[in-house]
């Protein structure tokens, strides 16, 4: 399993540009508990550079997961705190093989191989280096773990 910009909680869904007041995910056609969007928390996090408090009831339970996992995320993710999500997932994982990589230049959009995202307004070479590294890590991970099947 490869998780790119992972989250350790289920977030509220979005309709257009607005909160949906429903979970982003369902399981067996039932809405999962979710982290509600609160403008106050969002503004506080931006003004004081503090993480948004997590709703523990919205935590994604990975305790029974045993498959190999590769986590790829950014320490400067502008959408959610992927870095602390990686830490949380690693601390709760009970399986035998987990690998993670944290990048320091690119943000949330670490998704397109070999294409630096120009929305970050940083040196494209640094963005390209991280994009390439994440893609090669993904290929290596699949090569290592899918050959067994």
Regions found by a protein language model. Give the residues of each.
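Histidine-bearing beta->alpha loop at or near hydrolase active sites
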Residues: 75, 103-110, 114-118
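Conserved alpha/beta-hydrolase "acid-adjacent" motif
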Residues: 78-88, 111
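Cap/lid segment of the alpha/beta-hydrolase catalytic domain
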Residues: 14-20, 111-125
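Conserved serine/cysteine hydrolase catalytic core
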Residues: 58-70, 93, 97
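Short beta-strand/loop motif that positions the catalytic acidic residue
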Residues: 65-66, 71-77, 103
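Catalytic active-site module of serine/aspartate enzymes centered on a nucleophile-bearing elbow/loop
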Residues: 116-149
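Hydrolase active-site cap/lid region
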Residues: 1-48
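Active-site nucleophile elbow and catalytic-triad environment of alpha/beta-hydrolase enzymes
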Residues: 45-61, 75
């Amino acid at each position: 399993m490869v998780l790119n910009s992972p989250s350790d909680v289920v977030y509220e869904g979005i309709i257009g540009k607005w909160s949906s007041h429903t979970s982003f995910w369902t399981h067996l056609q039932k809405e999962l508990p979710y982290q509600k969007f609160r403008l106050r928390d969002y503004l506080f996090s931006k003004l004081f550079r503090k993480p948004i408090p997590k709703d523990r009831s919205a935590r994604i339970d990975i305790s029974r997961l045993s498959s190999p996992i590769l986590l790829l995320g950014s320490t400067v993710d502008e959408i959610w705190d992927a870095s602390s999500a990686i830490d949380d997932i690693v601390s709760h994982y009970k399986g035998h093989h987990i690998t993670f990589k944290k990048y320091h230049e690119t943000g949330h959009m670490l998704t397109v191989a070999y294409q630096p995202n120009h929305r970050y307004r940083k040196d494209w070479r640094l963005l390209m280096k991280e994009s390439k590294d994440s893609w090669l890590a993904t290929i290596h991970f699949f090569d290592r773990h899918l050959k067994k099947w």
